Curated annotation (Swiss-Prot):
Species in which this protein is naturally found: Dictyoglomus thermophilum (strain ATCC 35947 / DSM 3960 / H-6-12)
Pfam families named in the record: AAA, Lon_C, Lon_lid, LON_substr_bdg
Ranges of residues in domain Lon N-terminal: 16-208
Subunit structure: Homohexamer. Organized in a ring with a central cavity.
Catalytic residues as annotated in Swiss-Prot or TrEMBL: 684, 727
Lon proteolytic domain boundaries: 597-778
Name of the protein described by the UniProt record: Lon protease
Keyword Lipid metabolism: no
Binding site for ATP: 360-367
One GO location term (cellular component): cytoplasm
Length: 792
């Protein structure tokens, strides 16, 4: 190649193609090989080869594939392509001779490759005695470094000794010394030659110290290791080097980082003592061992738990009440209990969290109420399902000796909440099981005991964790499957099934708006009439909650949404009562309605079911026989005994009823409760059966508008029963105008909606004689007269 005097500024064009380099710095007067593979770079090289072969080379700040001007350093080197070679994979191997430093003034083009306006940086330095001394010192250091590196190329040392220019000497030594890429770029950007010599001297001195220490270490440990310990030797070398340089060993750095995190986590003294002990063990373990991973995981769990992190309670009682009312309809008892807790919490800041148990049938909002309580209190919410859990370790955790051991669900839930005072819901607590692996219910005793849970010990953690600030809320469908000891620790709040009035309110205030939102409709597009909602409740659902009601409403809204999307519906849809079958098909359920006329031997009872209440007709018939009692209708054992008691009571009153004893000796009494396929049980039909039998024997009709409930004794006393709320609502729905119930159940009327109480007359009785006087038409004056208390 021809010699060209390209070191003169006027020979370098003002505009140069700029080749971005990754992890490579080119110095002036240095010959360097480059591999070019990017499409833009290949195009740049090809154009340069067809021209003056001059290119600007600047290193990228980050090794991105497609750099922008902001990704490129502004100080670089202009060079000339000496030789190029194309490889089969279309990459180019270049040999480039660096010429002079350049500064990129501005980028003019980015496509098809970078072009920039540049200026050549000229070096003007007088070779003073000080500069000469710095050059000799640098050469001495370079010679020492060469002597410490086996197989160091001798020609590099000779070339360095023949360089007379101070700037070029600094560049040459920097290029051939093991500096990191940022340090090499720093040398390139140091324009002042004296300063450049100083920096290279500093870096070379540091590199020389590292080499001397490495050789010293190598000599010290050479006789102590064998070939199989090569990895250990390298680690020892690295550790010693880092120690001499004042750097920290990665292992030590990890231990220090863990110790710092433990301090920040504010562990209590006992937990901190255990953590320090495990940390000390960790520092002595080889990182590749299984025990190392187990211990590290354990420490991570200790660090991640919210030992001292609490959310601040929202003590604004009015605001909390608004939130509870926004999310749930009615449920006044539950809301009142939460507001009471807030009031006491406001007065006594260190009050322990209550432990509540919501009991009620499915779909009444137990789980969603927990979320609402958390929102009202301003706390985090976490829920775990206990249904089907049979292993105690699910609650208390596994010991760390087991492979894959983890904390129990309580501690996992606390970590998930990231707070030590969340609202913690234990869903389906009545469905806990037990087997040979232990009893989870017994493990929950400690969790739910306010006197013990301030030091709950999970088997995995092995140190106490304070659960006293947590508000635990358990949910259950029934109470009888919950162990008594566990039940005793919880404050039980019953969530009875919703009444028809409540379901109407929930449907209009919550379900319909929510389903409209989920289906992308506005309230201006569809409206439900009250009668239509009532028909859906009565004839298309039979449940205590509102889940199926929401499904049926969603079904109607989907059909309307389809019509709107297809364009067949353009006006507002009003769903009327007669439209419901069109959307949902034939009715799925029927509720009993009152009889059409007063009948002999047919009394109207009131029954409680899991889906609410219903009326129950009891039929009695006197047939030829031998004085036996025949019972049909799939009656349970308690109900059969109640029927026998009712018959015995009526027999004791035959004289008062003007019925001869001979009639019973020649006849059987057949008592039947319709819907024979459905099991029925309980004592509350006693007065109804007695009334039906008395009517059949006396041939006196029973009033069709009156319903009754109550347990009967042999002496005719009427005892209190349960489910009054549901029974009265069923009577109202069936069109009954009067209800007979035990006097001791009078207190239960508080749960009955006022609009229902206004339309029903209530008779409170203590004796079955009163029931017969009220229910049977044309009662004889000879019967013992009583004056039952009456409301209505």
């Amino acid at each position: 190649m021809e010699e060209r005097e390209l070191n003169q500024t006027q020979d370098i064009p003002e505009v140069l193609p700029i080749l971005p380099l990754r992890e490579t710095v080119v110095y002036p007067q240095m010959l360097i090989p480059l591999i070019v593979g990017r499409e833009k770079s290949i195009r740049l090289v090809e154009d340069a080869l067809s021209g003056n072969k001059l290119i600007g080379m600047c290193m990228q700040k980050t090794p991105v594939e497609d750099p922008t001007p902001d990704d490129i350093y502004r100080i670089g080197t202009v060079g000339i392509i000496v030789r190029s070679l194309r490889f089969p994979d279309n990459t180019l191997r270049l040999f480039v001779q660096g010429l002079q430093r350049i500064r990129v003034i501005e980028f003019l083009e980015t496509e098809p490759y970078f072009k920039a306006k540049v200026e050549v940086i000229e070096e003007k330095v007088e070779k003073t005695v000080e500069i000469e001394g710095m050059m000799r010192n640098l050469l001495n250091l370079f010679q020492k470094m060469a002597s410490l590196i086996p197989q160091f190329p001798e020609e590099l040392l000779i070339n360095a000794m023949n360089i007379q220019e101070p700037g070029r000497l600094a560049d040459f030594i920097a290029f051939n010394t093991n500096l990191n890429i940022n340090e090499k770029q720093e040398i390139l950007e140091t324009i002042d030659v004296k300063e450049r010599l100083q920096k290279v001297t500093y870096y070379l001195t540091r590199e020389l110290e590292i080499l001397e220490i490495a050789n010293k270490i190598q000599n010290e440990v050479k006789n102590e290791i064998e070939k199989s310990q090569k990895e250990y030797f390298l680690r020892q070398q690295m550790k010693a080097i880092q120690k001499e340089l004042g750097e920290i060993d990665p292992r030590e750095m990890e231990i220090n980082e863990l110790r710092q995190k433990l301090q920040e986590a504010k562990l209590p003294p006992e937990a901190m003592k255990e953590a320090e002990r495990e940390l000390e063990r960790l520092s002595l373990m080889p990182p590749g061992s299984a025990e190392y991973t187990v211990t590290r995981t354990y420490l991570d769990w200790l660090i991640s738990l919210p030992w001292a992190i609490s959310t601040e309670d929202n003590l604004d009682i009015k605001r909390a009440e608004e939130i509870l009312n926004e999310d749930h309809y009615d449920l006044e008892k539950v809301k009142e209990r939460i507001l009471e807790y807030l009031a006491v919490r406001k007065l006594k800041s260190d009050m322990k969290g209550p432990i509540l148990c919501f009991v009620g049938p499915p779909g009444v909002g137990k789980t969603s109420l927990g979320k609402s309580i958390a929102r009202a209190l301003g706390r985090k919410f976490v829920r775990i399902s206990l249904g089907g859990i049979r292993d105690e370790a699910e609650i208390r955790g596994h010991r760390r000796t087991y492979v894959g051991a983890l904390p129990g669900r309580i501690i996992q839930g606390i970590r998930k909440a990231e707070s030590n005072n969340p609202v913690f819901m234990l869903d389906e607590i009545d469905k806990l099981g037990s087997d040979f692996r232990g009893d989870p219910a017994a493990a929950l005793l400690e969790v739910l005991d306010p006197e013990q849970n301030n030091a709950f010990v999970d088997n995995y953690l092995g140190v106490p964790f304070d659960l006293s600030k947590v508000m635990f809320i358990a949910t259950a469908n029934v109470l009888y499957t919950i162990p008594p000891a566990l039940l005793d620790r919880m404050e039980v709040i019953e969530l009875p099934g919703y009444t028809e009035y409540q379901k109407m309110g929930i449907a209009k205030g919550f379900l319909i708006p929510r389903q409209l939102k989920e289906h992308g409709l506005e309230k201006e597009q569809i409206e439900f009439s009250d009668d239509a909602i009532r028909k859906i409740i009565r004839e298309y659902t039979r449940e205590a909650g509102v889940r199926n009601l929401e499904r049926e409403i969603a079904s109607i809204i989907r059909k309307v949404a389809k019509g709107i999307a297809e364009g067949s519906i353009t006006e507002k849809v009003i769903v009327k009562v007669e439209d419901v079958p069109k959307y949902l098909g034939p009715e799925k359920y029927t509720y009993g309605m009152k009889g059409e006329k007063d009948e002999v031997g047919v009394a109207t009872g009131l029954a409680w079911t899991e889906a609410g209440g219903d009326i129950l007709f009891v039929e009695a018939l006197v047939v030829e026989g031998k004085g036996n009692l025949i019972l049909t209708g799939k009656l349970g054992e308690v109900m059969q005994e109640s029927a026998k008691t009712a018959l015995s009571y009526v027999r004791s009153k035959l004289k008062d009823l003007n019925v001869s004893y001979e009639l019973l000796e020649k006849a059987d009494i057949h008592v039947h409760v319709p819907s024979g396929a459905i099991p029925k049980d309980g004592p509350s039909a006693g007065v109804t059966i007695a009334t039906a039998i008395a009517s059949a024997l006396t041939r006196r009709p029973v009033k069709k508008d009156i319903g009754m409930t109550g347990e009967i004794t042999l002496r005719g006393k009427v005892l209190p029963v349960g489910g009054i709320r549901e029974k009265v609502l069923a009577a109202h729905r069936a069109g009954l105008t009067a209800v007979i119930m035990p006097k001791e159940n009078k207190k239960d009327l508080e749960e009955i909606p006022e609009e229902v109480k206004k339309e029903i007359t209530f008779y409170f009785v203590e004796h079955a004689d009163e029931v017969l006087n009220l229910a049977l038409l044309e009662v004889k004056e000879s019967a013992e007269q009583r004056n039952p208390e009456r409301i209505g």
